[in-house]
């Protein structure tokens, strides 16, 4: 099996990136959903939850760098033609989902990484890169904004992944062509390709989808961040109104905080 792509087949490197990314993404989705639903009412439960989130974050950073390498490789390779290029609507949808997935591989882990860098003290990333990012302050507004973007873009990733898998199954079961087989190990037998129709429409559509998702995610997160930054005036007023004859003459107070993370 050749390492590089041709006009009709995917090479070994592209297949490796494809299946490595698929394994990481499916693992991350399962980890994120499972860890989010775990209780944290005891110290043992909190430690377990934090450990799973550390694993989730560490694999997420891994996906980010794998995605960058995959995208760079893809731009150096010819893209095999579509086997259903003569079905304009279907090929447009397939290409749009393809570009949405590429965006997901960068935006979802990056949003999560920025959310982590802006937060304090929970579930560290295990890569030796530190827990902060340049130009990202420890700030609850930034934390909430990119946390919401991570959730919204993650849902978009799951939706695009479902469509991608459904399309592959349709090609294999209904159309009975080599779309799925040529991404598997070995050399798939591929017949003559139909005439290819190159268009910017899928890229434009995917860009519009991502602009909308980013706007919604950041908008929701900024609203949550501003609410959390506001003090509780009723509690402050209640404390100020408390009358007491106590006076501090002399003494010291020691406070030690241990955080699991940055």
Give a label for each model feature:
Residues 242-245:
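A glycine-anchored, Pro-Gly-centered beta-turn/N-cap motif
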Residues 1-237:
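Membrane-embedded alpha-helical bundles that constitute the cytochrome b-like, heme-associated redox core
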Residues 248-262:
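N-terminal glycine/threonine-rich, aromatic-flanked beta-hairpin/loop signature
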């Amino acid at each position: 099996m050749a390492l590089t792509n041709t006009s009709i087949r995917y090479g070994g490197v592209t297949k490796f990136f494809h299946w490595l990314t698929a394994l990481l993404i499916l693992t991350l989705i399962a980890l994120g959903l499972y860890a989010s639903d775990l209780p944290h009412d005891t110290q043992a439960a909190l430690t377990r939850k934090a450990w799973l989130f550390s694993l989730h974050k560490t694999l997420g950073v891994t996906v980010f760098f794998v995605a960058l390498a995959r995208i760079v490789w893809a731009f150096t390779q010819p893209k095999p033609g579509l086997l259903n290029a003569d079905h304009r609507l279907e090929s447009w949808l397939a290409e749009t989902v393809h570009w949405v997935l590429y965006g997901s591989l960068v935006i979802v882990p990056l949003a999560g990484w920025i959310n982590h860098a802006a937060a304090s003290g929970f579930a560290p990333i295990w890569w030796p890169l530190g827990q902060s990012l340049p130009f990202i302050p420890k700030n609850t507004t930034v934390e909430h904004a990119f946390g919401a973007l991570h959730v919204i873009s993650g849902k978009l990733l799951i939706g695009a992944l479902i469509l991608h898998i459904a399309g592959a199954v349709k090609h294999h079961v209904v159309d009975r062509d080599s779309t799925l087989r040529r991404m598997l190990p070995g050399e798939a037998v591929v017949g003559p390709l139909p005439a290819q129709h190159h268009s910017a429409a899928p890229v434009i559509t995917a860009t519009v989808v991502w602009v909308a998702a980013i706007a919604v995610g950041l908008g929701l997160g900024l609203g949550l961040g501003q609410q959390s930054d506001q003090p509780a005036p009723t509690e402050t007023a209640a404390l100020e109104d408390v009358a007491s004859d106590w006076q501090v003459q002399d003494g010291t107070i020691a406070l030690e905080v241990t955080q699991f993370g940055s």
